[in-house]
A protein has these predicted regions:
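Transmembrane helix-loop-helix hairpins at membrane boundaries of multipass inner-membrane proteins
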Residues: 1-5, 19-113, 188-196, 499-500, ...
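Hydrophobic alpha-helical membrane-insertion segments
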Residues: 34-49, 168-177, 376-378, 414, ...
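Cytoplasmic/organellar membrane-interface segments at the starts of transmembrane helices
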Residues: 365-367, 421-517
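Alpha-helical transmembrane segments and their helix-start/interface "positive-inside/aromatic belt" motifs
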Residues: 26-37, 159-169, 365-369, 445-451
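Cytoplasmic juxtamembrane regions at transmembrane-helix boundaries
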Residues: 98-114, 237, 245, 437-446
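Short phosphate-coordinating micro-motif centered on Lys-Gly-acidic
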Residues: 139
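N-terminal signal-anchor/start-transfer transmembrane helix
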Residues: 8-25, 213, 220
Length: 517
């Protein structure tokens, strides 16, 4: 394709974001909606034009001083993994605009401009093929989200916005230092070139830790997750949707694009650390979710637990784990976004997120109850929904690396069923304790239009996940070729027929490879 479609997908929301600043409230709303729908249409064209099994990097664009220079270049291109994450971004953004249609009445043009800027930066993160360009997009996303929380958030919005900004900024400074070292050492800012460059094993440790500091906060991983519940509670509904749906995925994307392929030996050495932190996150945040009174906080803590499945899968160093982690990222983006929309539906009517104020909503809001049930089941991982496919593959991959880690991860699924079903029961079943809640009308036509598309994709991914796996399969293969020579030292899986831990699954695989040569 000769048309610079990736540049267009960055330019459309960026230009529209400037235009809306000069319009009235309704003009800003309609312009933002049309711009995001146009970008989604471009995304569909991108997906249709993507050639599965073709070149590793497609739709490439380059404007710069030439290869080998140390100056940032406008270098764009995507593989299948980036394609799926871009599709997730452009799919959710029109829904966010629709969710804000009536909820936001103050400084509407600026609000719409912030979301459009966010969309441009998100596409840029996943499409960037220049290291410094990636950093600009990656950190630029802080600004609109900081404004969305700090201006249009709840009562403690300033505290939440500062916490969000400071946490993410700290990790980003370390990552920038590491990037500068990498550029000077390798002599290039090209991400594909750096993915094939072999940094010394000792240096890889420090570079890996610097990148980990940034990506772990973005995921977020325990114990640097404490900014997320506050950010979700204070953010407007659409802010929570895009935060959980896309921004958290930037951390997982960073592990896939940088940590694993650029520092494979260090990644292998730090597998025990990642598994321990992920195991704590699954159990601890699930237990914390069980005692929450605020709907948004409960879903926020569940997000930390679900993203732990991503890190389990990605660092399992096998195909099932990595593919599972990627599908969990996509599924969580859809399901968590939908759950926050469900919270927004009742909050717009009763203006409270306290679970105890609701009950028996299935009587007067049956349509809402059905869709809320679907997203609850998807969050739990019910077969036939998107949540099952990714979690199952991630667990299988984790078991191949460590049976004990897989057991811990499985407890997270059990606890997840506990807090999600308990939330649903308290919201939709039982007696109606509040006359105001009992009088709430069912979903409006606008709300149906927001939730039904997500429900359709959740079912599509659960019934036929191949549509989403196929574009990413070759890229997972490229990643495995890069990381397989690294030996993981994690003595945690019992050998068959004994209770003695095997030396390492990957050690054995490496020995077989050595014999084959």
């Amino acid at each position: 394709m000769d048309f610079p479609i990736l540049s267009a997908m960055i330019a459309v929301p960026l230009v529209a974001g400037i235009i809306v600043l000069f319009l009235n409230d309704n003009g800003a709303r309609w312009t933002a909606l049309l711009a995001t729908l146009a970008n989604f249409a471009l995304g569909v064209v991108l997906w249709q034009a993507y050639e599965i099994g073709g070149d590793r990097w497609q739709f490439t664009e380059y404007v710069g001083l030439g290869e080998g220079t140390l100056v940032p270049a406008w270098a764009l291109g995507i593989d299948g993994i980036a394609l799926m994450l871009i599709m997730l971004s452009v799919f959710l953004m029109p829904i966010c605009i629709g969710a804000s249609w009536r909820a936001i009445t103050r400084r509407v043009p600026e609000y719409m401009g912030a979301f459009l800027l966010m969309e441009a930066l998100m596409v840029g993160v996943f499409a960037a093929q220049d290291l410094l360009l990636f950093y600009i997009f990656f950190e630029g996303g802080l600004i609109p989200m900081y404004l969305i929380i700090g201006i249009w958030g709840g009562a403690e919005k300033i505290k939440a916005a500062y916490k969000f900004f400071l946490y993410t900024l700290f990790g980003s400074v370390l990552m920038l230092v590491a990037m500068l070292y990498m550029i000077l050492d390798a002599g290039t800012t090209s991400i594909p070139a750096l993915m094939a460059y072999d940094f010394p094993a000792g240096v890889q440790w420090w570079l890996w830790l610097a990148f980990f500091a940034s990506f772990a906060v973005k995921m977020p991983m325990w114990p640097v997750h404490t900014w997320l519940p506050d950010a979700h509670v204070q953010a407007p509904t659409a802010g929570s949707v895009i935060l959980a749906g896309v921004l958290l995925k930037m951390g997982g994307y960073g592990f896939i694009r940088f940590s694993l392929p650029m520092f494979p030996e260090a990644s292998a050495d730090f597998v025990p650390l990642v598994f321990i932190l992920s195991g704590i996150a699954v159990v601890y945040t699930s237990l914390v979710a069980l005692v929450q009174r605020d709907m948004k906080k409960l879903i926020a803590y569940s997000s930390v637990a679900h993203m732990a499945f991503v890190t389990f899968g990605l660092f399992a160093f096998n195909r099932q784990g990595i593919e599972g982690g990627l599908i969990v990222m996509l599924s969580h983006g859809l399901v968590s976004g939908a759950l926050f929309l469900c919270v927004g539906v009742v909050y717009d009517r009763l203006h409270t997120r306290e679970i105890a104020r609701y009950g028996g909503l299935a009587d007067n809001m049956p349509g809402y109850a059905v869709l809320f049930l679907l997203f609850t089941m998807a969050s739990i991982g019910l077969p036939g929904t998107s949540g099952f496919v990714g979690e199952f593959l991630a667990l299988v991959g984790t078991y191949e690396m460590s049976s004990w880690a897989a057991i811990v991860a499985t407890t997270g699924i059990i606890l997840g069923a506990g807090y999600m079903l308990w939330l649903y029961w308290r919201m939709c079943y039982g007696t109606q304790k509040n006359a105001d809640a009992a009088a709430m009308p069912d979903l409006s036509m606008r709300e149906w239009w927001l939730l039904v598309p997500i429900a359709a994709v959740v079912m599509w991914m659960g019934i036929y996940p191949e549509s989403f796996m196929a574009p990413m399969r070759d890229d997972v293969g490229h990643l495995l070729e890069r990381i397989e020579p690294a030996q993981v030292h994690f003595d945690a899986r019992p050998t068959e027929g004994t209770g003695v831990a095997a030396a390492s699954v990957t050690d054995t695989a490496t020995d077989h490879k050595g014999g084959a040569h």
